[in-house]
Design a protein with these regions (language model features):
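Hydrophobic alpha/beta core scaffold segments
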Residues: 366-370
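N-terminal localization/anchoring segments of enzymes in phospholipid and broader phosphate metabolism
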Residues: 1-341, 359-363, 375-399, 403-523
């Protein structure tokens, strides 16, 4: 290659005597500190929203002075230097680590295009960009097609642009009265914020519940809150005792007869068009009047800081979500060997949930779980969790969706909550029932493909260890994320350039090897 790269810290280390020319340099190190990043918000909440925002700004400044947890260096420290740091930073020997690799690899992403020309191609994934959703009609407006039936997107295989288009239409539609949305994390130069500002400019009521306590996004959210506030949006900062972690968007409008109608969007992931290309999430858009009414009540109650409300369709933490999940598990327990639970989430830590899962296993319920992160329940423990299987999938994309299937695909819920105590009783979360049969089928297919993953999937054994999945000679290797990418490519609708709205969508039918996967579902 005719190009070479060198890290800035390496230059500084090599020229440290020039930088500190007034000192005699005996030894130099590349070093970084990891601090405790947890902030105590409870003592800094003020009555007025603007005061709270100012308090958050002050609180963030404390983060640079929080306790050091570890020290990383590029070579072992001399004894005197180490003792000096131990004393000044109030840390012990076990908190020092030596690395020969860079401490922060974030810069590699910026070099990707340069590296492709000089590195082994096998080091890179094949390029992939999100496709138009299978259920999205490119020949119709988002409003029109959501009014016809519910629409589902599975990121990053299907593009978040369809949701952004919905917001854009809402901003321009003269019949739209208001847009309400909960925000936890946003992209840099957020298109969501751009559409909300356009809506406000066009006279819509825009209400944003913006959580300032989203870890590491506090400063970004403070800045966005000011931008939205300056343009006349109503900004709420969640509730005093609970982080608002739910992903809910509600568009209220009038139909031709003057009736109030709703379009609701509930998802498992953030309104972040950047991470939607890296995180595997699910997003439902629906005109279901009952769900719309629930979402409207949800925003009204959050405005009043009332989190203890029972809704007709949606389940919300911290009041009804946990008890409802336990009740649905109990229903499957009563079925005995005919009971089924198929669950997907990031982590499982709640004691009552774990106890109920164990009861389900002992009653003969077939329990399948896809848990990417922490699992505090051990499967396959004789006499306790014999009927529980747990798989973790770690691949190209971060598995972030939460799906809860009760019975033989009888009830399916998606939403923002994990089976963790913090999500179930210490946060405001929302999960939503899936009513549309075609969407149920799509989610079940997604879950089944994940369960068949024998490439990136690992099973947790009775000791809590992760094991590779054994593959017999001749057995198909299935990478669930690659399978979803292939489905998205083959199923994306194609717009007819000669057609106008309301013409039937053309869909490519090139399933090829994915037919094998479907056959496996039927076995």
């Amino acid at each position: 290659s005719d190009k070479e790269w060198i890290r800035t810290e390496s230059i500084l280390k090599a020229k440290v005597d020039k930088v500190f020319s007034f000192y005699k340099v005996k030894k130099s190190y590349i070093m970084n500190l990891h601090r405790n990043m947890d902030l105590n918000y409870e003592d800094h909440r003020e009555d007025e929203a603007i005061d709270y925002k100012m308090q958050m700004k002050k609180l963030l400044k404390k983060r640079t002075r929080l306790q050091v947890l570890r020290v990383n260096t590029d070579s072992p420290l001399e004894k005197t230097t180490k003792e000096f740091l131990k004393d000044r930073l109030n840390i012990k020997d076990h908190q020092f680590f030596t690395y020969t690799s860079p401490f922060n690899m974030g810069y590699v992403f910026k070099l990707e295009n340069n590296l492709k020309s000089v590195c082994d191609p096998n080091l890179f994934y094949d390029s992939f960009s999100p496709k138009l959703g299978q259920m999205i009609d490119p020949n119709k407006s988002m409003f029109e097609q959501i009014e016809e039936r519910d629409r589902l997107l599975i990121y990053p295989y299907e593009d978040i642009d369809s949701f952004l288009k919905l917001l854009e239409e809402a901003a321009e539609n003269p019949d739209v009265i208001s847009i309400k949305i909960t925000i936890y994390r946003l992209a840099k130069n957020s298109k969501v914020v751009k559409n909300l500002l356009k809506a406000r400019e066009n006279g819509k009521e825009v209400t944003v519940i913006l959580e300032l306590r989203a870890r590491f996004d506090e400063e970004s959210n403070i800045n966005y809150s000011q931008t939205l506030y300056d343009e006349g949006c109503t900004i709420l900062y969640g509730t005093e005792d609970y982080k608002v972690h739910s992903k809910v968007c509600l568009i209220t409008y009038k139909d031709a007869s003057g009736n109030i109608k709703y379009i609701s969007q509930i998802g498992t992931g953030n309104y972040n068009e950047s991470t939607s290309k890296q995180y595997a999430d699910i997003s439902l858009m629906t005109a279901h009047p009952g769900i719309g009414k629930d979402c409207n009540n949800f925003f009204n109650h959050i405005n009043l800081e009332n989190v203890n409300h029972i809704y007709e369709n949606i389940l919300a933490a911290p009041y009804t979500l946990k008890s409802s999940i336990l009740e649905k598990m109990e229903r499957e327990i009563k079925k005995g060997k005919d009971g089924k639970l198929f669950l997907k989430c990031n982590s499982v830590t709640d004691k009552e949930i774990i106890k109920k899962l164990s009861e389900a296993s002992q009653a003969g319920v077939d329990v399948r779980m896809i848990v990417r992160g922490i699992s505090c329940i051990r499967p396959q423990v004789e006499g306790y969790t014999d009927n529980i299987e747990i798989k973790s999938i770690v691949g190209r994309y971060l598995e972030h969706a939460r799906v809860y299937i009760f019975g033989d695909n009888e009830e399916i819920y998606i939403g923002s909550a994990d089976l963790m105590t913090r999500n179930l009783i210490r946060r405001v979360e929302v999960i939503i029932p899936i009513y549309d049969p075609a969407i149920k089928e799509k989610i079940v297919e997604y879950m089944n493909i994940q369960w068949l993953d024998n490439t990136k999937g690992r099973m947790i054994n009775s000791q809590g260890k992760y094991e590779k999945i054994s593959v017999t000679p001749g057995e198909d290797l299935i990478n669930s994320q690659e399978a979803m990418m292939e489905l998205a490519k083959n199923r994306q609708p194609k717009a007819d350039p000669n057609s106008k709205k309301n013409k039937k969508v053309k869909v490519e039918k090139k399933e090829k090897w994915l037919d094998k996967i479907r056959q496996l579902f039927k076995k």
